[in-house]
Amino acid sequence: MDIDQYMTDLGRRARQASRAMARASTAAKNAALAAVAQGIERDAALLKEANARDVARAREKGHDAAFIDRLTLSDKALKTMVEGLRQVAALADPIGEISNLKYRPSGIQVGQMRVPLGVIGIIYESRPNVTIDAAALCLKSGNATILRGGSEALECNAALAKLIGEGLEKAGLPQEAVQVVATSDRAAVGKLITMTEYVDVIVPRGGKSLIERLMNEARVPMIKHLDGICHVYVDDRADLAKALTVCDNAKTHRYGTCNTMETLLVARGIAAEVLPPLGKLYRDKQVELRVDAAARAVLADAGVGPLVDATEEDWRTEYLAPVLAIKVVENLDAAIDHINTYSSQHTDAIVTEDHDRAMRFLREVDSASVMVNASTRFADGFEFGLGAEIGISNDKLHARGPVGLEGLTSLKYVVLGHGEGRQ
């Protein structure tokens, strides 16, 4: 296969399809989404069989537990896919919406219209759910997309792509609006991220090595996040029950996700109260604890162990595993300073009953999602009511946080006049 020519052909077809998608009716887009949802429900067993073969091959290659977790298509994951499709269909269509329309002294009216970005390239590794999430959001927002999933999910992604194509065809939309790259050759990625004439934006979803490669090589703009180094700070005015619930869920709900807590910060004034029960909870769930000296003293005194001494590198590490760094800090000032020094600007949370401290945390922590008395695991498009997300961005330009429909659009100026000329 000539990868260069193959990718160029995909890009050309996507660009052509993007023009049809930009003018597609809301009814047609929703019909396509409904058809894909019905197809997933109908073919759930076939999808799970294809996924099981992908998972078996991944295990044979020696991939770790976090990787297998992301790759596995469970009944719950299939249900979430279907719910996401229907939730996206139920969302208001932003395309064509005109806002901020104002009269100018010259007599013209100036406003802004929401329009699709055009062609979006999605590069991801071992998450078959991304195939559906990305297709749904790109479709509803009037974009065409080129999906390049990881080679480990090739069989499942091919089955999902077939369902998406059928859904588009039933709705009278071009099947080329959603194209899946049918090769695992890494050269396809290299070509996709440089096709500025056909691709308007790249959204990478994968490990750090993938993101770093794309940051170095891409010529097409990206919506991305590099790491998910998420923190929970337990303030000395926290409710103990809330702290236990939030800290347990933020770490142990799922280990292999970018919104999982990796560092726990505890105010010195509440450390003796909150660390022992948390330490025992984590020990019972076999979470390795990497602790500073102050946390070690409290936990050891409570009989919690084994404990590993934390290093500077631990504050900068996204484990994606049952490992947690714990640090005792003096107060809110120290917590905010630590977070803004080591955070990846993804998601950070505070547990406190003090309203002023909570508001200060929200204002001063420089992350895409900042939470009060809630688990970092809520940093998710589905949980935020976006229907699904195409990814999470910790950049500060264009889109930030979970990226849903509006993140895949832009605003253009529109001017309405009555024959006016500029004086």
UniProtKB/Swiss-Prot annotation:
Purpose: Catalyzes the NADPH-dependent reduction of L-glutamate 5-phosphate into L-glutamate 5-semialdehyde and phosphate. The product spontaneously undergoes cyclization to form 1-pyrroline-5-carboxylate.
Enzyme Commission code(s) on record: 1.2.1.41
Gene3D superfamilies: Aldehyde Dehydrogenase, Chain A, domain 1, Aldehyde Dehydrogenase, Chain A, domain 2
Cellular compartments per GO CC: cytoplasm
Domain of life, source organism: Bacteria
SUPFAM superfamilies: ALDH-like
Secretion signal, residue range per the UniProt entry: none
Official protein name in the record: Gamma-glutamyl phosphate reductase
InterPro entries for this protein: Ald_DH/histidinol_DH (IPR016161), Ald_DH_C (IPR016163), Ald_DH_N (IPR016162), Aldehyde_DH_dom (IPR015590), G-glutamylP_reductase_CS (IPR020593), Glu-5-SA_DH (IPR012134), GPR_dom (IPR000965)
HAMAP family recorded: ProA
The UniProt record lists the keyword Oxidoreductase: yes
Protein family per UniProt: Belongs to the gamma-glutamyl phosphate reductase family.
Molecular function (Gene Ontology), one example: glutamate-5-semialdehyde dehydrogenase activity
One GO term of the biological process aspect: L-proline biosynthetic process
Keywords: Amino-acid biosynthesis, Cytoplasm, NADP, Oxidoreductase, Proline biosynthesis
Reaction it catalyzes: L-glutamate 5-semialdehyde + phosphate + NADP(+) = L-glutamyl 5-phosphate + NADPH + H(+)
Pathway stated in the Swiss-Prot or TrEMBL entry: Amino-acid biosynthesis; L-proline biosynthesis; L-glutamate 5-semialdehyde from L-glutamate: step 2/2
Keyword Cytoplasm: yes
Main location: cytoplasm
SS bond partners: none
Localization in the cell: Cytoplasm
